[in-house]
C-alpha cells in the first residue's frame, strides 16, 4: 500500500520553466478510482482544446500504482506532457458553512492550475470562519464553489448553475445529473435563500451545506437518498 501523503514525480525535469498545468482530483475507494475513464477523458479534451502535449505513458496505470489498495484522494497534474501524482488522506464528511465570495467568478471551463480566484475566495471564507465559498459571475449569477459544483432544491426540482455561466462541469455534477432530473439555472444569490443546498465533487461526493451566509440551511431527505446512491458499487 502506498504511504499516507506521497508525491510521484513521474518524469523529473531539470531547469524546466513553470507553465500552466491541467489537474484532475480523484477519489480512490478500496483501491479503485470511480470514473477514472471520465477523469482522463476530460483531461484529454482539455489537452486538445488548449493545444498542450500529451504524456508519453499510460496515465491510468500511473494512477492505479499511486493508489495502492486503500481509500485515498489522488491529484494528477500534467504540465507540458509531464505527469505528477500526489495522494492524501480522505477528510471526514460533514455539513459545511458556506459564504458568498467577494471574488468575482471568471469562466473556468478547463481544470487548470490557474486557480487563483478560487484560492482567494477560499482564504477569505476561512478568514470569517466558513469552510468554503460560492463565487458569483460578473452578471450576478451563482456559479460554483472553490472546488465544488452547487445544487439546490426548488419547488420539487433539483437545480444547478448552468454550464454556460462558465463553470467547470465536474464529474460529481455529472454523476448527480445521471441519477436524477436536474434543471440548469441562472439565478442570483437571493434565489438560494431558504433552499436546501448541497455541494458535489468527485472526491467527497455529496456534502450538504449546513449554513449559508450565516443562516441555517433546511435539510431535504432527497439529498441523503442521492448521497447514498452516489458511489458506484
Annotate each predicted stretch with a short phrase.
Residues 1-134, 138-141, 164-167, 173-233:
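Conserved alpha/beta cores of soluble small-molecule-handling proteins
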Residues 142-163:
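Glycine- and Gly-Pro-enriched alpha-helical subdomains that act as flexible
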Amino acid at each position: 500500500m502506498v504511504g499516507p501523503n506521497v508525491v510521484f514525480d513521474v518524469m523529473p525535469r531539470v531547469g524546466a520553466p513553470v507553465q500552466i498545468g491541467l489537474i484532475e482530483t480523484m477519489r480512490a475507494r478500496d483501491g479503485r478510482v470511480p470514473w477514472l475513464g471520465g477523469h482522463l477523458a476530460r483531461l484529454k479534451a482539455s489537452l486538445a482544446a488548449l493545444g498542450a502535449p500529451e504524456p508519453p505513458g499510460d496515465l491510468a496505470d500511473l494512477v492505479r500504482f499511486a493508489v495502492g489498495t486503500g481509500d485515498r484522494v489522488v491529484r494528477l497534474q500534467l504540465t507540458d506532457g509531464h505527469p505528477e501524482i500526489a495522494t492524501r488522506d480522505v477528510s471526514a464528511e460533514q455539513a459545511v458553512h458556506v459564504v458568498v465570495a467577494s471574488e468575482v467568478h471568471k469562466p473556468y471551463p478547463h481544470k487548470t492550475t490557474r486557480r487563483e480566484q478560487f484560492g482567494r475566495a477560499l482564504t477569505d471564507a476561512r478568514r470569517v470562519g466558513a469552510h468554503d465559498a460560492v463565487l458569483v459571475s460578473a452578471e450576478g449569477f451563482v456559479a460554483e464553489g472553490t472546488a465544488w459544483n452547487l445544487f439546490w432544491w426548488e419547488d420539487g426540482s433539483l437545480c444547478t448553475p448552468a454550464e454556460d455561466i462558465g463553470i467547470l462541469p465536474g464529474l460529481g455534477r455529472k454523476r448527480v445529473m445521471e441519477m436524477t432530473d436536474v434543471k440548469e439555472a441562472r439565478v442570483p444569490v437571493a434565489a438560494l435563500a431558504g433552499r436546501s443546498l448541497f455541494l458535489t465533487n468527485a472526491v467527497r461526493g455529496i456534502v450538504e451545506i449546513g449554513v449559508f451566509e450565516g443562516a441555517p440551511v433546511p435539510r431535504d431527505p432527497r439529498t441523503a437518498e442521492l448521497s447514498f446512491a452516489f458511489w458506484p458499487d
